[in-house]
């Protein structure tokens, strides 16, 4: 996949993410599906909104060491956001990610090895794809939260943001 193809693919993840965030009921931020160790709705909104920032970090080859990344992530997932807060954060982080990726040379996108905190060094496009899929997984998680809460979401909401 080339850089333009990736950006098109990532836009397809972003658009429904923004729509799903906007549908989250602000009065249910403390809700989670059962007495299990998962994020609350508010924590998930915050986390989903910050996911694109990691794509910008990957594009800059600027991930911190694994222990520092893990510690920061553990702290970050404890934070919560309302839909009104998460929406603008998602948009800002998405714009920064797109700008950073657009600024890459195609050769670097395709072949530059970068350090990632979750495993051995990998090719830039693979790290970006991993982070895009991470966001996609949390988009699906939010979709399921909203479905369980009885909101009128469906396949078009999940994949087209409608």
Model-found features: residue ranges?
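Short, low-complexity N-terminal intrinsically disordered segments enriched in polar/charged residues
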Residues: 1-4
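Residues within well-ordered alpha-helical secondary structure of globular protein domains
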Residues: 23, 47-50, 92, 103
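Hydrophobic alpha-helical core bundles mediating ligand binding, dimerization, or RNAP-core interactions
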Residues: 10, 14-17, 21, 90, ...
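Acidic/histidine-rich alpha-helical segments that form the ligand environment
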Residues: 75-115, 122-137, 141
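Short, contiguous alpha-helical
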Residues: 7-11, 15-18, 28-75, 115-162
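Surface-exposed helix-capping loop/turn segments at secondary-structure junctions
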Residues: 23-31, 100-111, 148-153
